[in-house]
Amino acid sequence: MVRVRAIHHSNIPKCLRCGRRWWATCHRCERTVRLTSTASGIWPLRLLRGAVPGLISGPWLPFSPTTRPIYALQLLSVNDGPSPVAGSAPNRLDNGASVARALPHPAGRLAVATQQTKAGLSRQAKAGTAFRVAPNAYIVGATLAPEQAVAHHRTAIISMFWPGSVLSDRTALTGGMPFEGWIFISHPDPARRSDLELPGVTVSVRVGPGPLPGDMPMPDGLHISGPARRLVENVSIAGRPPRGRPSRQAGTELVGDEIDQVARQGGAGAVHNVLSQLDAISNHLPAGSVGVVRSLLAGVLGSFSGSKLTSERLAARLSGEPYDEHRLSMFRGLAELLGDTAPEPRPALGSPQRWTWEPFFEAYFSNFIEGTEFGVEEAREIAIDGVIPSERPADAHDVVATYRIVSDPVSRAVAPASADELLDELRDLHRILLAARPEKRPGEFKERRNYAAGYAFVEPDLVVGTLRRGFDVFSSVTDPMQRAVALMLLITECHPFDDGNGRLARIISNGVLTAAGQVRIVIPTVYRNNYLAGLAGVSNGNGRGESLIAVLRFAQKWTAAIDWMTFEATDEQLRRLDSYMDPGLAEASGIRLRLPEQT
């Protein structure tokens, strides 16, 4: 039984085309008036005719001018009644089923032109309520653009022409999505062998196996190539490249990248699974391509005997130093940006005495950023006088170790000239920095992935390879400040150790500046959120690093403006500039880091 209540007749809108007031469809011009689907379920009366029992009672339903319901009924309850819209839902509605499920979809519905429906569909197409997408295929009632509507019905359209086909080749690598406007499929005996041009996409078919073990089902009876099959299908083959469309094969290099991704995400077990799938389907696929994939998979397991690899990622994995391609792409973007950015040298002017207390405050703020919080007077006693509080010896050692590194003339000027030097310096400095925390494994790269606020840093087995290749990416960056920015991002993104990574990134970056006679970068507490936001902007893909460059340049400018000659004068100046203020409180109060001349 269906219970409904009526909407007042005065709410019927006019036909969008001829202006006359009719029901869901104007009988004079056959132009359908749109309905707005709602969770409560507003259905046009014509569609409910035959499903509504004899009497319709109840109060008039108020309406919103924005929804403009056509002469309609609101469904109050459904109890195993017949579907009001033929063909748009199952023959019987489940108890409590949502009415919105049966309402028109913005992408319309796909209709096949038969002898009985061809004339009607043609009239609808002329009236603008339907459009032809392929021979004998129409989309009716769509409010979306043709390209968007076709994207919604893509698998159904493919199934109309090639039932049981497989989304294969390059399309399998894109998860079934078009590549440069093309979809590639295979079918054992295609009835249509020419390309099918649809709005926004062209479907290209080739003769090939139907679904094989490991292939995954898709809507409308289609399948998509499984992990092993899609690797084989995308191996480069000899021959002239096609004209007017991309190659069906992504190429052996991308196949190697895919295998590297399998090994990275699932380890040796995932590689073994793909090999097992390959054994099960090898008789259905080209032997040469199967051999290439088998050799690459075996190489990941330690028995590669093939020729030179075309995939740098897979070659790096087989050499024992896989890397994070996503991070390298990030580093390339920053390197390009730095190459297009004019340098702004800021030499450390004045006598050495002017910078006497800079190392202490740098160490103090660097630890405070990481959560090792002491009052500045207490931190002075710890770092300078060697007074270690009994209740926090490890925290005190963090301050002492950082101060020792940044105040030493040699370690404060570390500027690695090669990737090997960078790796050695990182390990050596980490041993000093975390000497009081043996549980953090000083000097040893991490064995578990680390996170910050849900953001995942480079995986442990990719750290060395990413550091090496990232250092090479930045080899073209020669300006000291720009190189400091680059190494800051490189070390931060890799996060190579269990702890102490932020302090190490700042130490190495400042070492590059000191070695070139430039002003170091101090990040006071009030500026912490700006600093982290600059790093997060690059991590999250919000630009190539523009905000990070701006943040670090201002911090360097601020550092150059402070007089670091005596503790008392420096402390008084920093307090006047609100440098010790909690960053959250500062943001809430509208306070920001200021230069001395701005006070």
Predicted feature locations:
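Short, structured active-site "lid" loops
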Residues: V150-F161
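Cys/His-enriched microdomains
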Residues: P13, A24-H27
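Short Cys/His-rich metal-coordination motifs, predominantly Zn2+-binding knuckles/fingers
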Residues: C18, C29
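Cys/His-rich microdomains that often coordinate metals
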Residues: W22, V33
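Minor-groove-contacting beta-hairpin "wing" of winged helix-turn-helix DNA-binding domains
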Residues: A137-A142
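FIC/Doc superfamily catalytic core
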Residues: P44, L55-A111, K118, A127-R132, ...
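Flanking scaffold residues of small Cys/His-coordinated metal-binding clusters
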Residues: S10, R21
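Short, intrinsically disordered terminal segments enriched in charged and Pro/Gly residues
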Residues: V2-A6
